[in-house]
Amino acid sequence: MYCRGHELRKKLCEQYDIKPIGRFKLLNGRTVISDAGNMDITDEYIIFDCISKTDHNHHESIYCGKYVAEDLCKITGYSLPQLFNPLHYEHSSHGYGGKGSTNSSPKWNPVRKQLYDIVLLIITYQGNIKINSKIFDIKRELEDPKYIEYYPKLQIRSVNTYLIKMNKTFENIIADLQNNNNLRTFKYDLVLDYMEKNNISQHLK
């Protein structure tokens, strides 16, 4: 959804509940088109889910860089999400406080956390994908605080199916992203063990 200019962003925030749902580091050679002027973003990008205030079934999306994202968050009061950065040499940064912020980190189930990182890396790999994509549904389910301490059996099956439809294994994705990128290590041994114990066929490697 086009969002260039502060005044337009203010009007959009009157019409939509504009909530950030992800913030991702772009790797070498990858770009995302900004909705604030159709320019290529080359560093990091933020995804917003925009829900109509008059029809909650109507969703739009905004993909933008940090400057525009900070402006939207100042208007709405939401927090800028933590940056997902899969690289070794930079540290993830956090947003400022606001709606949706918390003072303490939730205690993740370790299998769920590994699967969550897998999902974030898939989104990083795919880039400019629609927010109604199944992978975003899985992301929302995994980060739901009501279930964050539980094993993600359903979501594991969903990720497996998603990878099959991509015709990629998670190992393939890691190998592709390692080209020209100092990618940090992403473990998924706990997910594999859980799948084996529950007789779930895997498409991770």
Where are these regions (language model features)?
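Extended, alpha-helix-rich binding/interface surfaces that flank or overlap catalytic cores
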Residues: 1-205
